Amino acid sequence: MNNQAYGVTPPISVANSTPKENELNDSLIKELKSRGSFESETATKKRVEVLNILQSMTEEFVYKVSIKKNISEGMARDVGGKIFTFGSYRLGVYGPGSDIDTLVVVPKHVSRNDFFEVFYELLKGRSELEEIAPVPDAFVPIIKIEFAGISIDLIFARLDIPRVPRDLTLDDKNLLKNIDEKDLRALNGTRVTDEILQLVPKPTVFKHALRCIKMWAQQRAVYGNIFGFPGGVAWAMLVARICQLYPNAVSAVIVEKFFHIYSQWAWPQPVLLKQIEDGPLQVRVWNPRLYALDRQHRMPVITPAYPSMCATHNITSSTQKVILSEFQRGIELMNDINVGKKSWSDLLERHDFFFRYKFYLCIVAATRSTYAEHLKYSGMVESKLRLLVQKLELVEGIELAHPYVKSFENGYYCDNAEEAHEIMNLYGTSKGDDRVKGVLHAENNDNNKENVENKVELHMTKLFIGLKLDLSKEGEKKLDIQYPCAEFFNICKGWQDFDSEKHFIQIKNVKLYDLSDDVYVDGETRPIKIAKRKRAVSKNEGKKKPKSVGTVSAA
């Protein structure tokens, strides 16, 4: 029995698992395996081999830069350089096809420019490299690579120390001194994941429970920080807290308690894995007593590593309602699973987002240019979607503005600008599906320049918000969302690289029965509108609820 104290409060129960709970746990692991949650031993060994190569390359990178900066041969060999992992790989919850979040840590004489020049060239010289995409201007500068069949996100941090030996750990807060904000953000990922693993009583129990909750959150479409839902680190911390409260429980019990505890949680009381610490930096630490912005956080989940921050600051009124509703569904299903009425597969059933609402807003970001340029623009629009959600929540008549957590992309080569505009105007609807039949797909071009000469290249990304309306007020006819849409357009057009000749943004209202086919997956039958019989119009017709959201202007 594990009697060590974990967390900011005593445990709720230190009871060991019962035979029935162990049986339930076995069936959970079996379900996760059947859904491909675990990677093969061979694939995992390959990851380790690739990380060993990257470690050697990091040392070679630091050596080359050191020599270039007139450091002696002996010292250049000794200054080191080390890689750290973070995210799902470090937490031990990765699956087939998962990427590896990797941090390259270097001594003080190696710069970020060196990373994007010298290390970049070293990577390009490797036969294992399949793809490489440097993004030096990102919030956390990154080099994305496909290396020996594995996707890897490489970020960089320079420490204010002369050597980075292989046995260096990042738990000493003093290592954060005299570094810039980008370095601090880069180091934070590894420091947070390392602390989470140190703060759970039984790491294996935590990992299996997290695999389940992560899969549940993805299946139920409540996973994604950028869209106003918890991201991977936040879900990990939420699971870790339950592990602290039930230190001797098996993973199946952790999952059950997860839903019960968080559906009754006194939000906005924060979820903490340890007391918030002070440190040596003049940086802001999460503190709702001091900062008004921190008081606005609806479901705060606080990172354990200094400087502590809220990992769920993007949650809105609507996304909180959606999350709490999913917690309640989880409770009901766990009750049935416990008595054998339901199975784990019912808990992990796919969401019904594209069946749930009568009205949807389809936000279209379009670029008449290359796919690479479109990715930058559409990424910016995605990052701003939650701001539109927040503005819609203030509109009278909107009870819920529910963002979907994935985008859909398509590219076409159009005959002319008029055809491109027509396709754009219908994109996201069933009519749009019909319109593009026979139009050359940009992704299927195979770089055949003869096929696309004099064509207009068009790339589009669509995002969806489901609207739950309450138009019960007497005489309420229309929902006016012109103002929040206009504000959103202005935000997008305020992007520093916005070009009105190339970049376009639209918001259109689409009814359930008019959604495009690609939002449904194999096995789902899209809703079909049943034609109603015509009837006589009564004199009270004007008092009934409206049948549409009204027209939304496009920009």
Curated annotation (Swiss-Prot):
Disulfide bond sites: none
UniProt GO BP: co-transcriptional mRNA 3'-end processing, cleavage and polyadenylation pathway; nuclear mRNA surveillance of meiosis-specific transcripts; single-species biofilm formation on inanimate substrate
Residues the record lists as binding Mg(2+) 2: 99, 101, 153
Keyword terms: ATP-binding, Magnesium, Manganese, Metal-binding, mRNA processing, Nucleotide-binding, Nucleus, RNA-binding, Transferase
Disordered: region residues: 1-20, 532-555
Cofactor: record remark: Binds 2 magnesium ions. Also active with manganese.
Residues reported to bind ATP: 86-88, 99-101, 153, 214, 223, 232-233
Highest classification ranks of the organism: Eukaryota, Fungi, Dikarya, Ascomycota, Saccharomycotina
Positions with a binding annotation for Mg(2+) 1: 99, 101
UniProt organism field: Candida albicans (strain SC5314 / ATCC MYA-2876) (Yeast)
Site (Interaction with RNA): 139, 144, 313-314, 386, 391, 487
SUPFAM superfamilies assigned: Nucleotidyltransferase, PAP/Archaeal CCA-adding enzyme, C-terminal domain, PAP/OAS1 substrate-binding domain
Catalytic activity entry: RNA(n) + ATP = RNA(n)-3'-adenine ribonucleotide + diphosphate
Matches recorded under PANTHER family: POLY A POLYMERASE, POLYNUCLEOTIDE ADENYLYLTRANSFERASE
Cofactor dependence: Mg(2+); Mn(2+)
InterPro entries assigned to the protein according to its UniProt record, in alphabetical order: NT_sf, NuclTrfase_I-like_C, PolA_pol_cen_dom, PolA_pol_NTPase, PolA_pol_RNA-bd_dom, PolyA_polymerase
EC number: 2.7.7.19
Gene Ontology CC: cleavage body; cytosol; Mei2 nuclear dot complex; mRNA cleavage and polyadenylation specificity factor complex; nuclear exosome focus; nucleus
Entry similarity comment: Belongs to the poly(A) polymerase family.
Alphabetized Pfam families for the sequence: PAP_central, PAP_NTPase, PAP_RNA-bind
Localization (cell): Nucleus
GO molecular function annotation: ATP binding; metal ion binding; poly(A) RNA polymerase activity; RNA binding
Translocase is among the record's keywords: no
Something else known: The C.albicans mating-type-like (MTL) locus contains, in addition to the genes for the regulatory proteins (MTLA1, MTLA2, MTLALPHA1 and MTLALPHA2), a and alpha idiomorphs of a phosphatidylinositol kinase (PIKA and PIKALPHA), a poly(A) polymerase (PAPA and PAPALPHA) and an oxysterol binding protein-like protein (OBPA and OBPALPHA).
Role description: Polymerase that creates the 3'-poly(A) tail of mRNA's. May acquire specificity through interaction with a cleavage and polyadenylation factor.
Protein name: Poly(A) polymerase PAPa
